[in-house]
Amino acid sequence: MPIVELADPICPVCEFPSNVELHFGGLVCGACAAFFRRTVSLNIRYLCEKNNQCKGMRKNCRACRFDYCVKIAGMKRNLVKQRRNSTNTPMYILNRRKDSGNEEVVRGMLKRMYLQFSSFSGFVTTTQSKWAHHSRKSSMSPNKEAEKDVSKILKISHGSLLKYYIYQITHDKRNNMNTLNIKSVEEFLEITSVQNKLAAELCKTCPGVDLLDNEDILILRKYFQFSNVWIESTWNYLRENNSVPIDDSELDLKLLKFINQVKSTLLVSFSQLKFNTIEFAAFKSICIWKLVYHETSRAMKIIAQEHYESVMKALNDYYQTYTSMDSMQIATRIGEITLLIISVFQMYHDMAKLYIQLGLPF
């Protein structure tokens, strides 16, 4: 009798294959259970721009996701244990309550990922103009200049933050296996396992993460892992000048197709732009903080913007101090680096679909 391989059940809320269990009176996946618990315990009410009539995956709209938790999955608010004190309550929640004088926190609509893709080109153009202007500024007094060189939110100087990312790619080499050279799914799983643990460690030391709640930190870990497994592997693959044929006959065809996609897009871009270590460290940090594939809180968006601006200011200072580039050349170079994020967005989206198809944790 042939063995029937049972697929994971589909979560009725997010519609992803997952380990569905009973949580708060409804059968849902662990991620949706955590979302429901956090929403209820913090007394958050989300708003939907389509009056809770969004189609497709509910993960793209937190209001519709919560609505499905209650109406479709049958989850019950009264089964969630209320927080006894505000010790672990995110600061933005406490500030919102203080400003409004209301215990309920109303949060606005979350834009879908494809809207962010379509508006990103405009963002790049604005960034180029902004950094050209920044490069020309030289009239500020030394004290004010030093004051502006420190992020008040992250509590670290722009240069030190960039060094944090440089250290990651130059010193942390506990796993020399490269994803683009794997010969089997087993090797790939070994790499992702190591990088998942490393991502957890990096999240503990990353400036500003202490201001985020646990749900945001779990999302951030995925971005760190993605950047290590795919982006850094691509850069190392180029630097090592890999031209030796790899026996990939045992590799899953879907995984092989994605690896070839990475080589034909990101690898080609890297070979054209010729990043040095400092530029790549800056690019990697942007990839981590500009990826907004799943829903993120306002606090996380603030921290992400702070990382982006601080790293880019440090990169701009590096160009001004250690290269002969003028302000327009600096603006153009930073624009090229930023523009490359668009292909990384698509790459992350395709990777997410691949992991689901392969039944890998994501």
Swiss-Prot record:
SMART domains: HOLI, ZnF_C4. Residues 145-362 form the NR LBD domain. Its main location: nucleus. InterPro entries: NHR-like_dom_sf, Nucl_hrmn_rcpt_lig-bd, Znf_hrmn_rcpt, Znf_NHR/GATA. It is found in: Nucleus. A zinc finger (NR C4-type) spans 11-32, 48-69. Transmembrane segments: none annotated. Keywords: DNA-binding, Metal-binding, Nucleus, Receptor, Transcription, Transcription regulation, Zinc, Zinc-finger. Gene3D superfamilies: Erythroid Transcription Factor GATA-1, subunit A (3.30.50.10), Retinoid X Receptor (1.10.565.10). The keyword Ribonucleoprotein does not apply. GO terms for cellular component: nucleus. Residues 8-82 bind DNA. GO terms for molecular function: DNA-binding transcription factor activity; sequence-specific DNA binding; zinc ion binding. PROSITE patterns: NR_LBD, NUCLEAR_REC_DBD_1, NUCLEAR_REC_DBD_2. The keyword DNA repair does not apply. Orphan nuclear receptor. Belongs to the nuclear hormone receptor family. This is Nuclear hormone receptor family member nhr-77. It comes from Caenorhabditis elegans.
